[in-house]
């Protein structure tokens, strides 16, 4: 069972106060949807938590909760994991992507007869949500710079994870290829290490333990100053195979593109195994996932195929550039700087836009002029437009790759569906 805030009745084991809070939250969510103000999951959760601050803890009591957190890939991994765990029982998940306490509360309010709660968690809120939900497993995928005006610097965030998770009884499934994640998870009692890769390394050259300069020969990494080093992984991504702890390779056949999703699938298989789901079964179930909240979806705009891609930070843009069709495929870039995106756009200068040289590029969004300056410096030929329809009309033949950050992506989805 997937997660919609109204999808099922609350558990009969809830207190009268908790039941009232759930009912009021669902009513608020319904009003929000009727007013055209989105899914209502956030406002519904806020109302419910105002009435019962302990509601999240109550809703999680009868679930095997799995938390997924990362800078990039957490929504997709949550979707893949929910599908994999359905092999072992019903699942409730915050599929609408609201990953802070209010949205998570709304999702779990629709748990019905679910056995598993598969929950995506914003990095900043991980320790608090872990405290409230008593998870059986926690997946830590990666950490890199993102919304520094809202979130902490990456090492500070890793330190919050390390301190907040140090006493957890959960099994922690952590990416051994990310030094920040490894350092954060090293304080936990039960850790399964996964060699899931790390394409973007610009935030991982300073040792999180002592501040020394990291050495990264081949796939290994270590700090010569303090001895902090990559742990021996239990699971590994090798090519297009997941290698389990026994050394058995299992093929990954996703419909989702790119190496990042092979990495997500590897972590998912490791998490699913904690609950007795065989890697082959988990990977086969992941094959059914075609798109995630609009990501990777292809749509027709005025008769032209447009593929929708989300990129929110330097690491995400780097990964997305590996997915797009080769030049001269047309590319649309859209960037906003609303609160959900982070209002500081200086991160644009950390993205290697030189990779777009040779592509016809069309720039739109609230901060299109900021992006235009960055592309000018990168030597990329571009045209500023006001809408996706205008870009489509001017684009040369070929599939159009549309890359947008968070709120620009949501606006783009609305525009192509209208």
Predicted region positions:
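Short, charged/polar "capping" segments at the starts of alpha-helices
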Residues: 126, 179-183, 339-344, 367-373, ...
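Active-site beta-alpha connecting loops in nucleotide-dependent enzymes
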Residues: 199-200, 292, 310-384, 418
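Gly/charged, well-structured mid-domain segments that form the phosphate/adenylate-handling core
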Residues: 271-311
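Short active-site oxyanion
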Residues: 115-117, 168-172, 304-306, 355-362
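A glycine-rich beta-strand to alpha-helix segment
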Residues: 390-418
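Cys/His-rich short segments
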Residues: 195-243, 252-255
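Phosphate-binding loop of NTP-binding sites
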Residues: 6-193, 201, 205-206
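A conserved, hydrophobic alpha-helical segment in the catalytic core
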Residues: 133-142, 220-230, 256-287
